[in-house]
């Protein structure tokens, strides 16, 4: 069975997932594809492993931006696809292959049906970490073509194909990575009094962190601390000199993020004192909340209901993290969920989005961009 052009593009990209700022094959694929398009009205730049494309409008009054992230995840794929990842231990498990494909489809339509306004397509690396949106936004390459408004999407396994979901205002949470390294004194298991056990210290820290949210954050202002990984020790009869905790912090408000971090630091200081150890905290990548511009989002949802075949759902806030929030902090715009009807969720080794969504999304976004880009 033959597949459509953009389904094939998605499958090509799905085979070559790459982690943040190492998306060299992905970047080259995007550039090669752009090279097949008529270039009379196109301008192309690269930034690190990202790509920025401008389609010059017929009578521009503003610049409309579309952002698509392009990186993969360090996950071993279990989909059983014939076009599964050829990069061992890496997978497009968050749908960025679809995001990029839809962006290329919209770009193709924009070249053949030029609108009045300029369009800028931002193929952004490193959304999964360490974060490409903020440095890309601050780059000279993007500053020259900085959009006046911007939009982005993220696939949603739980929604059916033909459905989008979004809301005015806060959509996604503030997020921060959390790493805590503890160092004490190792020793023989038979002589615990001569050592300083960092497995025990780490265990106490994990349990104490559970009280940060329940006793320091307003119950109406959601927040999460999750410790997803603990490492420490070497063998069963040696007391561990070191341990490391890795986790994530997510809050709906900036104020709660500050409060949570303050309490974490106080608790870690207490662990240092009580276990006579050294502790180092690293917050790693931190992402600003995704806050949709109210008027633009309301207008987009109304347009979708009245002028397209897509179903629109007003969703609730999610504790998801997205560095697109940095772009929305600087540029009016919005993000929305795009239903892909997958049994398995984001970051799962068996995520299998319904490819029918690709053509639907391209047609839908082209309708919106033409409507928005030709209005005066």
UniProtKB/Swiss-Prot annotation:
Transmembrane segments: none
Catalysis: reaction(s): N-acetyl-(2S,6S)-2,6-diaminopimelate + H2O = (2S,6S)-2,6-diaminopimelate + acetate
The keyword Amino-acid biosynthesis is assigned to this record: yes
InterPro entries per record: AcetylDAP_deacetylase, Amidohydrolase, Bact_exopeptidase_dim_dom, Peptidase_M20, Peptidase_M20_dimer
Catalytic center residues: 69, 128
SUPFAM superfamilies, per database record: Bacterial exopeptidase dimerisation domain, Zn-dependent exopeptidases
Lineage of producing organism: Bacteria, Bacillati, Bacillota, Bacilli, Bacillales
Entry function: Catalyzes the conversion of N-acetyl-diaminopimelate to diaminopimelate and acetate.
Protein keywords: Amino-acid biosynthesis, Diaminopimelate biosynthesis, Hydrolase, Lysine biosynthesis
Pfam family, one: Peptidase_M20
Organism: Bacillus mycoides (strain KBAB4)
Annotated protein name in UniProt: N-acetyldiaminopimelate deacetylase
GO molecular function, one term: N-acetyldiaminopimelate deacetylase activity
EC number from the UniProt entry: 3.5.1.47
UniProt pathway annotation: Amino-acid biosynthesis; L-lysine biosynthesis via DAP pathway; LL-2,6-diaminopimelate from (S)-tetrahydrodipicolinate (acetylase route): step 3/3
Domain of life, source organism: Bacteria
